[in-house]
């Protein structure tokens, strides 16, 4: 049932192979769309019930879209009572979509694990010319998985096409740090990627798009991205620090001898680097302060803190590669925290824009802080948090690092010439 395709890097798109051969015989030009689209349209449920038929979605040159296999049909949903409660289609863009993190994440998104079992989604996958064949493989696996909520899959290499009208942008793709590469050079190279993606989001995405930056250094990449999107609110941008929060919860649970779900209100403050601050002062175990349960202050201040900060490096030594599955899980957790009401008295960690924050943290950077959500995709900062000298001193150290990174990328944020002075290398090994 699938449609065979021929890929032309020069055209940056896909052309059905039979059409390409026919065009050569007739000496005519076949239009090459820049996006290859796999589509199973969500149509009005009431109309489907009334018509009771499955019809083909227009494809190829006639409609400007191409479909593959089962995604070419509009399906009869009259036997599905749940169709009446299905929500409006949510469109999600994922960059670095052919990578290991995405390989775990995309199937969680398609299954309904993230947005719910009544939420149809469309996936728009961004890659490069080099990864395009791998993207086709990802598309094929998604098709073969028969997810009923997955209504469209598009693959492409241009952010202006892939980001068109998206509701969520999960920016995973970034250049890895090569041997001997200075951290300042990595900031510049990846900063240019996120500046370009920010401009594309600003031009074509939904005005209320939610952006989660995963590619490292994610805090400063998120700052660069939001500075290049004047038409999108700065509060819509997040840097992923949920994996760090999950790691901290794990260590507290292991030390206390409880299950993970008993641990709450664990905040990661600051940068996604070894200057991050896992906050045990405000954390709770079964509603009680952690320091009442774990009375070993030396362990909390030293071993616990360093274990969380260096977890990524230890993992790559053991596993031989950086975390992928746990990163995908943390992306799921981060999104669910924004689309699900936060339980009363609890909060979660995410890197957000600091301007207007109540803690005294420097403004105009992206800094991980404790947040709550009403489940509408937005958030508010938690205000009922405690500070002591130990916590505040470490927060200021991470703040200083982010301010230094900001100076390194001033040329990408519209703030003049860059000046980079990063004497200490605090990148997370294997996660850069």
UniProtKB/Swiss-Prot annotation:
Give the binding site residues for NADP(+): 96-102, 190, 214-216
Control of this protein's activity: Chloroplast NADP-MDH is activated upon illumination. In order to be enzymatically active, disulfide bridges on the protein must be reduced by thioredoxin which receives electrons from ferredoxin and the electron transport system of photosynthesis.
What EC numbers are recorded for this enzyme? 1.1.1.82
Question: GO molecular function, one example?
Answer: L-malate dehydrogenase (NADP+) activity
Q: Where in the cell is it found?
A: Plastid, Chloroplast
Q: Which residues bind substrate?
A: 177, 183, 216, 247
Active site positions: 272 (proton acceptor)
Q: Which InterPro entries match?
A: Lactate/malate_DH_C, Lactate/malate_DH_N, Lactate_DH/Glyco_Ohase_4_C, Malate_DH_AS, Malate_DH_NADP-dep_pln, Malate_DH_type2, NAD(P)-bd_dom_sf
Q: Which sites bind NAD(+)?
A: 197
Cysteines engaged in disulfide bonds, as pairs: 67-72, 408-420
Indicate the enzyme's highest-level EC class. Answer: oxidoreductase
Q: What is its main location?
A: plastid
The record's GO CC annotations read:
chloroplast
Set out the biological process GO terms recorded for this chain's protein: malate metabolic process
**Where does the transit peptide start and end?**
1-40
Site keyed Activation of NADP-MDH: positions: 67, 72
**Quaternary structure and partners:** Homodimer.
Query: What family, per the record?
Result: Belongs to the LDH/MDH superfamily. MDH type 2 family.
Alphabetically ordered keywords of this record? Chloroplast, Disulfide bond, NADP, Oxidoreductase, Plastid, Transit peptide
- The protein in question is named Malate dehydrogenase [NADP] 2, chloroplastic
CDD domains in UniProt:
MDH_chloroplast-like
**What's this protein's function?**
The chloroplastic, NADP-dependent form is essential for the photosynthesis C4 cycle, which allows plants to circumvent the problem of photorespiration. In C4 plants, NADP-MDH activity acts to convert oxaloacetate to malate in chloroplasts of mesophyll cells for transport to the bundle sheath cells.
- Its catalytic activity? (S)-malate + NADP(+) = oxaloacetate + NADPH + H(+)
Species whose genome carries this gene: Sorghum bicolor
């Amino acid at each position: 049932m699938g449609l065979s395709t021929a890929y032309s890097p020069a055209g940056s798109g896909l052309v059905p192979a039979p059409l390409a051969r026919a065009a050569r015989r007739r000496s005519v030009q076949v239009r090459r769309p820049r996006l290859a689209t796999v589509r199973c349209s969500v149509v009005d449920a009431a109309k489907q019930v009334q018509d009771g038929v499955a019809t083909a979605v227009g494809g190829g040159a006639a409609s400007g879209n191409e479909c593959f296999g089962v995604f070419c049909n509009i399906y009869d949903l009259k036997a599905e009572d749940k169709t009446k409660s299905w929500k409006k289609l949510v469109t999600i863009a994922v960059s670095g979509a052919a990578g290991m993190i995405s390989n775990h994440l995309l199937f969680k998104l398609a299954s309904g694990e993230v947005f719910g079992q009544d939420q149809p989604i469309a996936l728009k996958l961004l890659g490069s010319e080099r990864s395009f064949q791998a993207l086709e493989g990802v598309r094929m696996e998604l098709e073969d998985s028969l997810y009923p909520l997955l209504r469209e899959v598009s693959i492409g290499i241009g952010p202006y096409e892939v980001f068109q009208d998206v509701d969520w942008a999960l920016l995973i793709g970034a250049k890895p740090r090569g041997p001997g590469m200075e951290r300042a050079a990595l900031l510049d190279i990846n900063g240019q990627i996120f500046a370009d993606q920010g401009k594309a989001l600003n031009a074509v995405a939904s005005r209320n798009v939610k952006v989660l930056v995963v590619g490292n250094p994610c805090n400063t990449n998120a700052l660069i991205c939001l500075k290049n999107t004047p038409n999108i609110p700065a509060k819509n941008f997040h840097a992923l620090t949920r994996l760090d929060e999950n790691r901290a919860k794990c260590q507290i649970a292991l030390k206390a001898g409880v299950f993970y779900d008993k641990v709450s209100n664990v905040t990661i403050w600051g940068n996604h680097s070894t200057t991050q601050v896992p906050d045990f002062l405000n954390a709770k175990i079964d509603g009680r302060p952690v320091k009442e349960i774990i009375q070993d202050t030396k362990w909390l201040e030293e071993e616990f803190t360093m274990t969380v900060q260096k977890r990524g490096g230890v993992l790559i030594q053991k596993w031989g590669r950086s975390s992928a599955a746990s990163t995908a899980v943390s992306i799921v957790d981060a999104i669910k925290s924004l689309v699900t009401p936060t339980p009363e008295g609890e909060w979660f960690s995410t890197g957000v824009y600091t301007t207007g924050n109540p803690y005294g943290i420097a403004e105009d950077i992206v800094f991980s802080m404790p947040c709550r959500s009403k489940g509408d995709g937005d958030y508010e900062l938690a205000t009922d948090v405690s500070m002591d000298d130990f916590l505040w001193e470490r927060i200021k150290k991470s703040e200083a690092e982010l301010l230094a990174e900001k100076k390194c990328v001033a040329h990408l944020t519209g703030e003049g010439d860059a000046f980079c002075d990063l004497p200490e290398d605090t990148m997370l090994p294997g996660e850069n």
